[in-house]
Each structure stands twice: as C-alpha cells, then as structure tokens.
C-alpha cells in the first residue's frame, strides 16, 4: 500500500501535515506523538525580526470553531533557525516553513536566510487576515501575488507554496496569479475573517475586533475552494480547513488536494494528526486501494 505523495519534487511518506500556527514546530506535541509518523511539519509563521503579535484577548471560541488574532507572534528567523530547525533535524519528516512579512523586502530576507538551511519547502503566507501590514493586503490582489512570487522565486532555493486567502471574490483568480508568478504549489484555505461580540461588556471579544475563523464550521467552504482551484490550475494543493478526522481529510483529497493539513483539531486533540493518518490507511485497506494517488481529485 503506497501512501507516498509528491509536491514540487519533494516526496512525503504520507499526505498529512500540520497547519501553520497550530502545532508550533512540534516541540510540545512530540511528548504525545511520534513526529516521524507525520508526512511533514508546517511551522508557525516566521518573520525577519521578532514580532510581538496583537494585544490580548486574541482568541475566542465560536460554534464549530474559533477566532484567533494572534498576529503571527514569533521570535524572528535567527532564533527560529537556532532553536526550532535544530530541533526538527532529528526527525525523518519533511519540514515546511511558513514565511510572513510586512513588506516584500522582509519576505525576501527570510527566504534568503533559510536558503541554506534544512528546509524542504517554503509556505508564503500572504493571506493572514489579522495582520494589518503585508499578508492579507498582498493576498487579495492578483497582480501583487504575481509580483511577490516573481521576486521570491529569484531568491528561494526551496520550492515555494503560496497560501491563499478565502476572503476574496474568486479564489481561482488568486491561484492563477500565483501560478503565473512561478509558485510550485498552493495551500488553502487560510482562515475566514470573523467577529464576535461580548454582549455583557458591550465590547469586541477580540482586541483586534476581527479574527481568523477556523474549525469544523469552515470545512464545506474549504472543500469547495480546493475543488475549484484544483480545476483551475495545474499546481499541487495542500488542502486545509476544519479537518478533524480521516473522513474530512479524504474529502479534501478527493476534491483535488495532494496533501492535507490538520489545524484547529490539534488544540482539542494532540493525537489528531496521527489519527488522521491511521484513518486514511484503514480506509485504503478496507477499500483495497493500493495507492493514495488514485484518490487525488477522483471526484469530478
């Protein structure tokens, strides 16, 4: 039974990774799961210098999910390389580093700093909805996406994945722009912009006012967008958005995703990623499927 999948020449032992920002770099989760079991680990967003993130409160629960406005808090790329990448080197698991920035220059600085490191792929975060500078401002303009990709590809040594925002009129236009700019793969969806009001205090539940919504409630939207993008471009896709179990993951794969990312479920169940992998393998055995690749985009 073959569970290997390939994105931009990089082969994953299985089609399951973690969604950026929900798993750190795996340090805490390594106490619960064998990180060697994962197809890949996608790290939290990394910028050129430390980012403090947004003011608190910055997380709120919703029906079927959560809102977050963390603001891509991180220690900066130098500390990330020294601490996080050093930790990840001990595992036989592919490493995808999520790159964020407030300007094209900052994206380039991070990409150049990582060019000689043990990183398999870069995920360009141009779609975080709760960072006022960069990120989402770039991800909603197809011309800007193509321009950023063209610039990043001049400096990147690793294949580049572009993470797409669902907060657009037509996500396929953004996907086409990323493809035209030279992207090697796409990941989608990032979180949907949402809001919650604390009626007792007559105030916003999150200091940032709005936050990114994730969790099971967004899954039907995410599956639909993966299907649309898979039929609009020729790039491989990492699908995500509300995956809780193997059945959810298989929906994304059948819609056209080569790899799936488990996100918010990690906060509820630290074993979620491994359980998704085991569930996919069980589905393949039960249905006598010899190659996971036969399921990718099988629903037309």
Swiss-Prot record:
<feature type="binding site">
    <location>
        <begin position="241"/>
        <end position="242"/>
    </location>
    <ligand>
        <name>FMN</name>
    </ligand>
</feature>
<dbReference type="GO" id="GO:0004589">
    <property type="term" value="F:dihydroorotate dehydrogenase (NAD+) activity"/>
</dbReference>
<feature type="binding site">
    <location>
        <position position="98"/>
    </location>
    <ligand>
        <name>FMN</name>
    </ligand>
</feature>
<dbReference type="InterPro" id="IPR049622">
    <property type="entry name" value="Dihydroorotate_DH_I"/>
</dbReference>
<dbReference type="GO" id="GO:0044205">
    <property type="term" value="P:'de novo' UMP biosynthetic process"/>
</dbReference>
<dbReference type="InterPro" id="IPR012135">
    <property type="entry name" value="Dihydroorotate_DH_1_2"/>
</dbReference>
<dbReference type="InterPro" id="IPR050074">
    <property type="entry name" value="DHO_dehydrogenase"/>
</dbReference>
<feature type="binding site">
    <location>
        <position position="20"/>
    </location>
    <ligand>
        <name>FMN</name>
    </ligand>
</feature>
<feature type="binding site">
    <location>
        <begin position="263"/>
        <end position="264"/>
    </location>
    <ligand>
        <name>FMN</name>
    </ligand>
</feature>
<feature type="binding site">
    <location>
        <position position="215"/>
    </location>
    <ligand>
        <name>FMN</name>
    </ligand>
</feature>
<dbReference type="InterPro" id="IPR013785">
    <property type="entry name" value="Aldolase_TIM"/>
</dbReference>
<keyword id="KW-0285">Flavoprotein</keyword>
<dbReference type="Pfam" id="PF01180">
    <property type="entry name" value="DHO_dh"/>
</dbReference>
<feature type="binding site">
    <location>
        <begin position="44"/>
        <end position="45"/>
    </location>
    <ligand>
        <name>FMN</name>
    </ligand>
</feature>
<dbReference type="InterPro" id="IPR033888">
    <property type="entry name" value="DHOD_1B"/>
</dbReference>
<dbReference type="InterPro" id="IPR005720">
    <property type="entry name" value="Dihydroorotate_DH_cat"/>
</dbReference>
<feature type="binding site">
    <location>
        <position position="44"/>
    </location>
    <ligand>
        <name>substrate</name>
    </ligand>
</feature>
<keyword id="KW-0665">Pyrimidine biosynthesis</keyword>
<feature type="binding site">
    <location>
        <position position="189"/>
    </location>
    <ligand>
        <name>FMN</name>
    </ligand>
</feature>
<dbReference type="GO" id="GO:0006207">
    <property type="term" value="P:'de novo' pyrimidine nucleobase biosynthetic process"/>
</dbReference>
<dbReference type="GO" id="GO:0005737">
    <property type="term" value="C:cytoplasm"/>
</dbReference>
<keyword id="KW-0520">NAD</keyword>
<feature type="binding site">
    <location>
        <begin position="190"/>
        <end position="191"/>
    </location>
    <ligand>
        <name>substrate</name>
    </ligand>
</feature>
<comment type="similarity">
    <text>Belongs to the dihydroorotate dehydrogenase family. Type 1 subfamily.</text>
</comment>
<feature type="binding site">
    <location>
        <position position="125"/>
    </location>
    <ligand>
        <name>FMN</name>
    </ligand>
</feature>
<keyword id="KW-0963">Cytoplasm</keyword>
<feature type="binding site">
    <location>
        <position position="163"/>
    </location>
    <ligand>
        <name>FMN</name>
    </ligand>
</feature>
<keyword id="KW-0288">FMN</keyword>
<feature type="binding site">
    <location>
        <position position="125"/>
    </location>
    <ligand>
        <name>substrate</name>
    </ligand>
</feature>
<feature type="binding site">
    <location>
        <begin position="68"/>
        <end position="72"/>
    </location>
    <ligand>
        <name>substrate</name>
    </ligand>
</feature>
<comment type="function">
    <text>Catalyzes the conversion of dihydroorotate to orotate with NAD(+) as electron acceptor.</text>
</comment>
<keyword id="KW-0560">Oxidoreductase</keyword>
<protein>
    <recommendedName>
        <fullName>Dihydroorotate dehydrogenase B (NAD(+)), catalytic subunit</fullName>
        <ecNumber>1.3.1.14</ecNumber>
    </recommendedName>
</protein>
<dbReference type="InterPro" id="IPR024920">
    <property type="entry name" value="Dihydroorotate_DH_1"/>
</dbReference>
<feature type="active site" description="Nucleophile">
    <location>
        <position position="128"/>
    </location>
</feature>
<dbReference type="InterPro" id="IPR001295">
    <property type="entry name" value="Dihydroorotate_DH_CS"/>
</dbReference>
<comment type="subunit">
    <text>Heterotetramer of 2 PyrK and 2 PyrD type B subunits.</text>
</comment>
<comment type="pathway">
    <text>Pyrimidine metabolism; UMP biosynthesis via de novo pathway; orotate from (S)-dihydroorotate (NAD(+) route): step 1/1.</text>
</comment>
